[in-house]
Amino acid sequence: MTSERTPSEHDDGAPRSRSRRRFLAGTAAAGVGAGALAGGAIGAAVASGPRREEEPRLPARTEPGFDHVVVIMFENRSFDNVLGRLYGPDDLPAGESFEGLLPDERTNTSAGGLTVGTHVYEGATDSVMRQPDPDPGEEYPHVNTQLFGTVDPPENAGRTVGAMTAPFNAPADASAPTMSGFLEDYVQHLRVMKKGQEPTAEEARTIMGGFSPEMLPVFSTLAREFAVFDQWFCAVPSQTFCNRSFLHASTSHGFVTNKQGGGYEKWLADDLADAPTVFNRLEEAGRTWRVYFDALQVVSYTGFLHAPVLEKYWKTHFSTMDRFYADVENGELPDYAFLEPRLVFDHNDMHPPTGVLHEDEVDGTPVYDSALSDVRAGELLLHQVYSAIRESASTTGSNAVNTLLMATFDEHGGLYDHVPPPSATPPGDGREGEMGFAFDRLGCRVPAIAVSAYTRAGTIVHDELHHGAVIRTLSALHGLEPLTARDASAPDLFGVLTLDEPRQIGDWPTTVPQYLPPNPEAAPAHPAHVNRDKPLSPPAVGLMGLLLARYGEPGEDLPTTYEGAYNALLKHGASLFGGS
């Protein structure tokens, strides 16, 4: 089946392309209809697509490298979940190795004796593309169980995170993760969600599943045609806030949870004004930077997370995505550009769904329709960002030859990965670790892909990296002082430069995203108007928590639905940040 995809009204300024090829390339891969089976049928169009030999040559740099860095960070996927099957023993680049799942699958066994192996998701396409459903546990105690198979004290097994107690499932010796507890932790998580009812084997097994390359053609094409990192770990074995904080501040100020131990207010405390970010370092050095977020979201996640040091730049250095696409087209990218996916309404951040367990659990009416928490929406966003950079041809400013695009994820989100996280350098910022964590070990592997004109197709970077590599690279480029001991000792990204001469635009692949069904959240004028009771994802709840912690009124309830988020954003956030 093939059909032409019409861009969503919420593409937020993504250019329609000089030749319209960018969106006309978005045809449906064979078998992506509502009833199609996943595994071999869907997403079959992984092919690179046509090359554009007719494009004029762009000037090379005086030496291999890049002048502009663009980073986009998605949500809550492990390396094995997204890229674990990128290469098998029969299709590796010559002389290369790859730390993936093939040819040997892995297993986990639950305390109840259920054994589940790693597998490719199967089933109806629209269901498959939002797995795992529901969202696994991602907080520090959950991750301890996932990595070590421990539950300590035993009573933590039946508790929510807020009720768990020390040592928060951490073993006495945390030096050798076994990666054996993902299934057991998910079983416990489902049991709590189902109020004590035992989950079925079918419900539990999704935690060990993942996508084939054919299912995620954009990620797979870019990973194969440029560089993939098979040893990139997130900064903290926990959830969103602390990992996104480490990306730009090289610390999470001792926090390992979004809201435990002080609420969302802890991220906005006055004493964090002495903890600068790499944005502050760039500003002090006279370099340019900008954070781009989706207009539908109204406020920037990054801006709020680092409000004590970035609020003064909200009007001047934060813009919506239409400005990003214009900056790319006009050759006006800053030295560093950070992109936020849409995290609240109609989200394209690739975060797994949250809410009820089954799509037909409420009065027999589907709770999740196609493209809700759908990884294809994230694929489309990456396709739009990459395609814009691929077509950037300024001869005097930023262009495809002098720009590095990095795509990665904040954390593994509780999804299985088989590689034990290594030890880490603590930030050394003098802040006591929440839940007794010493910040001396990294979190799980996450997908990470680099796109550069100076990167040979089939590049696999085996160096052990983590989120601190972004700060370390920017510091090396612009002579910045380290923020903490973590980024001071971090490796950089220059290992992706494997060519002496740049690949011209005509040698870059044309990515072909899968057909993305219309999202019922995207119409009419605003998702909140027809999806009032839809539950917010954890990142969206966190953003609402920060918004109310800063601007909310005493006693104001934390929004947990689309309608609540819409009202809160309209009331408190409408004029806080710069626009296009």
Feature map (PLM): residue ranges:
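N-terminal pro-sequences and low-complexity stem/linker regions of secreted or lumenal proteins
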Residues: 2-7, 16-18, 25-580
